[in-house]
């Protein structure tokens, strides 16, 4: 047999055989690109360069263009989408016979297809990869031949230092040894002092650059990454055990993950390079591999990038530690036990890693039951705190209050228009018709609609009643003696869902003179005995249960026999869930002397119910159609149409057996089966005084809270809540108490008790680096909006009013927990199109904080003043010194605070 080609090809060969982009063959021309790049400046947009020559612009403005995209069809060099001119995009949009959709980023060496609107992957063996390799070699050779370009800032600093040295030399013609030492120390300070550098924009990557600027000014992160890179010391892992905790020392033999190494390389380059602008292409590519959503050079969110970056490095470090743990435990435990232990550590977040050590903190949610006053705790880790902006709460209140009013209005309109579904609109009525004819037509249409709805309703209910009657009726009990029932209290309410009983208030009828009683509020039938003589029926508002007997036919008069009325009876639960409410205004009397039946018209009559329809039905069945006196002939037609349905309903109701088994219970317990246990969070019940359960590290009442400030956002985030209604607490203590009181009738079922409770979330373990996220981007209904209001934030933040009284990593007796601001990320513009910039504080590293991270020892006395430093505003590659007031007036989106020790 002959082998098929491509069956044993490696993965890279498959990529060559099946290219991802279908436009690759037509949009790639090697010869044209190589000819176009002879003796040209690759890092400059050729259109911008031509415009600058015409306009005589400065070189600084042209240098701000972050990225250059090379057309792989003709070799055109244009600026990217994030620039103002967008020459590369305009070059693609120019109509041509062949597509110029494939471009290459000269800084990052990534290919992009405009038609696919996606990145084009390639390898070295492919045609595109060979061209990229050729261009990279040409770029390196050109850089070696050309002189090293020094940034403008470094040139300025070198000129300043040379002038200062010359001044010192000319001032002192005979310098002594001390002057030489001072000059040497000054030059060393200039060289060792931390600097601020710009970052190249790789294509709408300002969100990435702003985060990287703040992380580069976090000295503790660089120290921890250096420790991770060298892995000198073994990692100690605490093995929690009920009997005796053990300490396991793990030697990390494996190298850190690719994202961690890229982060270490980026921070090293930021601190040690002499360039004024750094290109973080390797780090950004590793982030895109971890999170595909950041591919494509689209506008993204800085807070999401920070979370993905930290979570990615944390996952790599945890994986490295768990592999070392499994190797060290192989000699004593089985593989299955090791897997269980590792999973348990991951759930408890007890595996040490540098991300949790620096950015990680802990929130504690305290919940107290208002019935038994049991205090329970829930611990939740955090890497940053997302704080709601106060303006968002007002919008939520308005959005919550408006829909119910609209719904009520719509329901009222539906109820009003329900009777007019079959009525023509006013505009359709001819203007020549008289008002009397219009009213008559509307009345006729309404009555016809009522009759149709009546038939539809009783068709469903008749079938339902017949099915229930077959289940509930007993064959032995055919006749039940007449009894009177006692009245039910007004406040008694049925317990079954959907229970609608039927009441009728019957007034006395003497010698054919009938009087209808008004004001019937209940819906149960109160039927008294009907005799053949001139007897009055018992009237009044007596609520009685109904078991209707059959209506006898064959005589001219109606003989109503009411049988089977029992005392204090309710409908069975199977009937309660299905029977609809039926209002009846029955007019029943002694009809021996009167053969005529008058049906009084009522304004609104419920379909298929009432003595009117029953009497008219009986008269029609007996052949006395003339005895029915009505004003409208259409009403008679409606009664004739519904006569059969009413008769079937009456026969079905006769077979209903009424029971009084249900009683309203006072125990507020929701019984759920074992399979439907509510998904609740596990709480740790603690023995704590309810009076001090919600106490904080310092008093919250004396806070100078402004309406729109970070303090107000923190106060709103940690305020005390009351859990009521659907948010009630599932209290295990109350459940056990209630279960002990109940009888053992419901075996095999668990009973859960929900009670009102109080809840408050506070910080129980502060993080060394506190990151605050202000939720400016909100979703209001189907629209997205940004809150542009200025939120005040302090330079020194005291977190003690928002921490628990038993807060960890705080010295005893300390009532302050101070943080110093060192970084801000600002978002300007709207949600659709905006720009991220960074404010960073250039300062010396906090040695006390680094000591606490490595040793775990907390100094007894913390600092009260922030360290000295200078602030800079960085927008991609542009760096500018600013004042503190400019920083505090910015529209902050992310705030970076460092703990003061």
Swiss-Prot record:
Gene3D superfamilies: Cysteine proteinases, Zinc/RING finger domain, C3HC4 (zinc finger)
Enzyme kind, highest EC tier: hydrolase
GO biological-process terms attached to the record: anterior/posterior pattern specification; cell division; chromatin organization; mitotic nuclear division; positive regulation of DNA-templated transcription; protein deubiquitination; protein homotetramerization; proteolysis
Record InterPro entries: Papain-like_cys_pep_sf (IPR038765), Peptidase_C19_UCH (IPR001394), Ub_carboxyl-term_hydrolase (IPR050185), UBP16 (IPR030849), USP_CS (IPR018200), USP_dom (IPR028889), Znf_RING/FYVE/PHD (IPR013083), Znf_UBP (IPR001607)
MF-aspect GO terms: cysteine-type deubiquitinase activity; cysteine-type endopeptidase activity; histone binding; transcription coactivator activity; ubiquitin binding; zinc ion binding
Amino acids binding Zn(2+) 2: 45, 48, 79, 87
Skewed-composition ranges (Basic and acidic residues): 420-429
UniProt domain USP: residue ranges: 197-900
Reaction it catalyzes: Thiol-dependent hydrolysis of ester, thioester, amide, peptide and isopeptide bonds formed by the C-terminal Gly of ubiquitin (a 76-residue protein attached to proteins as an intracellular targeting signal)
Regions annotated as coiled coil: none
EC assignment: 3.4.19.12
Matching CDD domains: Peptidase_C19K
Active site: 206 (nucleophile), 835 (proton acceptor)
Cellular compartment(s): Nucleus
Acidic residues biased stretches: 410-419
Cytoplasm found in the keyword field: no
Gene Ontology, cellular component aspect: nucleus
Pfam family, one: zf-UBP
Annotated Polar residues bias: 482-494
UBP-type ZnF: 19-139
Subunit structure: Homotetramer.
Comment on protein domains: The UBP-type zinc finger binds 3 zinc ions that form a pair of cross-braced ring fingers encapsulated within a third zinc finger in the primary structure. It recognizes the C-terminal tail of free ubiquitin.
HAMAP family in the cross-refs: UBP16
Protein role: Specifically deubiquitinates 'Lys-120' of histone H2A (H2AK119Ub), a specific tag for epigenetic transcriptional repression, thereby acting as a coactivator. Deubiquitination of histone H2A is a prerequisite for subsequent phosphorylation at 'Ser-11' of histone H3 (H3S10ph), and is required for chromosome segregation when cells enter into mitosis. Regulates Hox gene expression via histone H2A deubiquitination. Prefers nucleosomal substrates. Does not deubiquitinate histone H2B.
Name of the featured protein: Ubiquitin carboxyl-terminal hydrolase 16
Protein's organism: Xenopus laevis (African clawed frog)
Gene name linked to the record: usp16
């Amino acid at each position: 047999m002959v082998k098929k080609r491509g069956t044993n090809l490696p993965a890279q060969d498959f990529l060559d055989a099946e290219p991802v982009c279908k436009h690759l063959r037509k949009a790639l021309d090697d010869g044209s690109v190589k000819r176009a790049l002879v003796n040209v400046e690759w890092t400059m947009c050729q259109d911008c360069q031509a415009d600058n020559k015409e306009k005589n612009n400065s070189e600084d403005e042209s240098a701000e263009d972050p990225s250059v995209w090379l057309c792989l069809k003709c070799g055109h060099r244009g600026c990217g989408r994030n620039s103002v001119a967008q020459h590369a995009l305009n070059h693609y949009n120019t109509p041509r016979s062949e597509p110029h959709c494939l471009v290459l980023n000269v800084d990052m060496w990534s290919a992009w297809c405009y038609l696919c609107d996606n990145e084009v992957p390639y390898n070295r063996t492919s045609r595109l990869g060979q061209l990229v390799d050729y261009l990279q070699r040409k770029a390196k050779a050109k850089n070696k031949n050309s002189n090293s370009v020094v940034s403008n800032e470094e040139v300025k600093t070198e000129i300043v230092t040379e002038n200062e040295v010359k001044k010192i030399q000319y001032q002192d013609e005979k310098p002594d040894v001390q002057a030489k030492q001072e000059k040497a120390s000054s030059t060393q300070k200039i060289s060792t002092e931390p600097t601020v550098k710009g970052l190249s924009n790789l294509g709408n990557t300002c969100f990435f650059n702003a985060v990287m600027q703040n992380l580069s000014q976090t000295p503790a992160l660089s120290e921890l990454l250096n420790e991770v890179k060298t892995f000198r010391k073994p990692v100690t892992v605490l093995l929690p055990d009920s009997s005796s905790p053990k300490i396991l020392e793990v030697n990390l033999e494996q190298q850190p993950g690719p994202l961690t190494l890229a982060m270490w390389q980026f921070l090293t380059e930021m601190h040690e390079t002499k360039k004024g602008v750094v290109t973080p292409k390797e780090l950004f590519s590793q982030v895109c591999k971890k999170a595909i959503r950041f591919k494509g050079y689209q506008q993204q969110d800085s807070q999401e990038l920070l979370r993905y970056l930290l979570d990615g490095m944390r996952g790599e470090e945890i994986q490295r530690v768990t592999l070392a743990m499994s190797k060290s435990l192989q000699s004593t435990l089985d593989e299955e036990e090791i897997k269980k232990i590792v999973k348990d550590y991951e759930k408890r977040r007890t595996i040490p890693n540098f991300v949790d050590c620096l950015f990680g903190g802990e929130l504690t949610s305290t919940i107290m039951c208002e019935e038994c006053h049991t205090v329970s705790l829930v611990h939740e880790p955090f890497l940053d705190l997302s704080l709601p902006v106060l303006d968002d709460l007002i919008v939520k209140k308005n959005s919550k209050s408006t829909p119910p009013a609209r719904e009520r209005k719509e329901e009222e309109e539906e109820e009003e228009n329900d009777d007019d579904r079959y009525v023509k609109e006013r505009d359709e009525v001819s203007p020549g018709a008289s008002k009397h004819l219009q009213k008559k037509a509307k009345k006729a249409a309404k009555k016809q609609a009522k009759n149709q709805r009546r038939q539809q309703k009783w068709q469903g209910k008749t079938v339902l009643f017949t099915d229930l009657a077959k289940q509930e009726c007993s064959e032995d009990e055919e006749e039940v003696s007449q009894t009177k029932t006692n009245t039910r209290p007004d406040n008694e309410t049925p317990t079954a869902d959907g229970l609608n009983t039927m009441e009728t208030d019957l007034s006395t009828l003497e010698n054919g003179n009938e009087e209808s009683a008004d004001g019937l509020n209940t819906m149960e039938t109160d039927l008294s005995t009907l005799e053949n003589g001139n007897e009055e029926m018992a009237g009044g508002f007596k609520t009685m249960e109904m078991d209707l007997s059959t209506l006898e036919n064959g005589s001219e008069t109606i003989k109503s026999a009411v049988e089977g009325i029992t005392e204090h009876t309710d409908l069975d639960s199977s009937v309660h869930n299905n029977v609809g409410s039926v209002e009846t205004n029955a007019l029943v009397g002694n009809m021996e002397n009167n053969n005529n039946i008058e049906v009084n018209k009522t304004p609104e009559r419920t379909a298929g119910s009432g003595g009117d329809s029953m009497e008219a039905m009986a008269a029609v069945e007996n052949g006395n159609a003339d005895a029915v006196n009505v004003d409208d002939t259409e009403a008679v037609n409606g009664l004739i149409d519904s006569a059969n349905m009413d008769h079937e309903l009456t026969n079905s109701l006769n077979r209903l057996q009424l029971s009084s088994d249900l009683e309203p219970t006072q125990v507020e317990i929701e019984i759920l089966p074992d399979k439907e246990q509510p998904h609740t969070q596990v709480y740790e019940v603690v023995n704590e005084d309810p009076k001090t359960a919600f106490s904080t590290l310092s008093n919250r009442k004396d806070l100078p809270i402004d309406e729109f400030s970070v303090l107000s956002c923190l106060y709103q985030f940690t305020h005390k809540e009351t859990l009521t209604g659907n948010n009630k607490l599932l209290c295990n203590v109350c459940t056990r108490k209630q279960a002990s009181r109940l009888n053992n009738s419901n075996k095999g079922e668990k009973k859960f008790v929900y009670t009102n409770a109080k809840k408050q979330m506070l910080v129980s373990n502060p993080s060394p680096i506190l990151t605050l996220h202000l939720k400016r981007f909100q979703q209001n209904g189907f629209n997205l909006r940004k809150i542009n209001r200025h939120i005040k934030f302090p330079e020194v933040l005291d977190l003690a009013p928002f921490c628990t009284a038993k807060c960890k990593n705080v010295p005893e007796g300390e009532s302050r927990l101070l943080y110093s601001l060192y970084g801000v990320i600002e978002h300007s513009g709207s949600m659709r199109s905006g720009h991220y910039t960074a404010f960073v504080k250039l300062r010396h590293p906090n040695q006390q904080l680094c000591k606490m991270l490595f040793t775990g020892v907390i100094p007894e006395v913390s600092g009260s003043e922030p360290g000295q430093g200078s602030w800079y505003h960085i927008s991609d590659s542009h760096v500018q010194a600013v004042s503190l007031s400019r920083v505090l007036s910015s529209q902050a989106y992310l705030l970076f605070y460092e703990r003061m020790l």
